[in-house]
Amino acid sequence: MKGEYREQKSNEMFSKLPHHQQQQQQQQQQHSLTSHFHLSSTVTPTVDDSSIEVVRRPRGRPPGSKNKPKPPVFVTRDTDPPMSPYILEVPSGNDVVEAINRFCRRKSIGVCVLSGSGSVANVTLRQPSPAALGSTITFHGKFDLLSVSATFLPPPPRTSLSPPVSNFFTVSLAGPQGQIIGGFVAGPLISAGTVYVIAASFNNPSYHRLPAEEEQKHSAGTGEREGQSPPVSGGGEESGQMAGSGGESCGVSMYSCHMGGSDVIWAPTARAPPPY
């Protein structure tokens, strides 16, 4: 066949070449085949003793072109503020103290009442006199809130060793005739209209017993040194008597009387002079 004839002719042609040149020709053919399929860094000798260097290309992208290391991403979260303001609205006919107390228990927070506005009715206050400690007095009628001061502490955790602290609620009220009353609330504080309370919440209060043990030791040492000094004369008995009389005169309060809230006698308001 035609193809077989050409192959035979080529074989005869290579057979006529010298043995050394035939080996170089075969090596050149093999290197050309390998360089066609695989690019590698090789040196191929030729007939005229020259060399051809084939450089192999590395696979993949060059370093630094892509997929650079990214800086770590830090997710920051805003912490809860230590105190948050609240505006509490108590409708008419509700106990203001109990409403705020339920709000604190539901939210598990402590609340410090800053101010309040509105009107309340039938207020029961505690007697401030030490002689009548534990007794209360009730004022009937409608009163306007002038100031409110209260603290509702959050329930302490079970593992806490802090002593329980009682909550307190104090008010200052203005009566219909301009009289001013106030004190610790000892009963329901029923709202006669819509009452607005401005408060601030707090969490995890820290308890400290004052004075500390170090301060007590320091004060005891200074007291012993002061006790060795001679007493100072100068009418101490007279000043003590004056202080005692002044304390008795100032200790009389409208809450120490044994009258009901409706029987309290208020001072008459000053009248304007008649025109001439």
From Swiss-Prot:
The main location is: nucleus
- Asked whether the keyword Transcription is assigned, the reply is yes
Q: Which Gene3D superfamilies match?
A: Hypothetical protein, similar to alpha- acetolactate decarboxylase, domain 2
Which InterPro entries does the UniProt entry name for this protein?
AHL15-29, PPC_dom
UniProt GO cellular component terms:
nucleus
Could you tell me where this protein is found in the cell? Nucleus
Swiss-Prot/TrEMBL keywords: DNA-binding, Nucleus, Transcription, Transcription regulation
Q: Which SUPFAM superfamilies match?
A: AF0104/ALDC/Ptd012-like (SSF117856)
CDD domains xref list: DUF296
Pfam families noted in UniProt: PCC
Note the DNA-binding span(s) on this chain: 56-68
**Ranges of Gly residues composition bias in the record:** 233-248
List all Low complexity biased stretches: 20-31, 40-49
Q: Name one GO molecular function term.
A: minor groove of adenine-thymine-rich DNA binding
Skewed-composition ranges (Basic and acidic residues): 1-10, 212-227
The annotated region (Disordered) lies at 1-80, 212-248
Q: Protein name, please?
A: AT-hook motif nuclear-localized protein 17
- Gene coding for it: AHL17
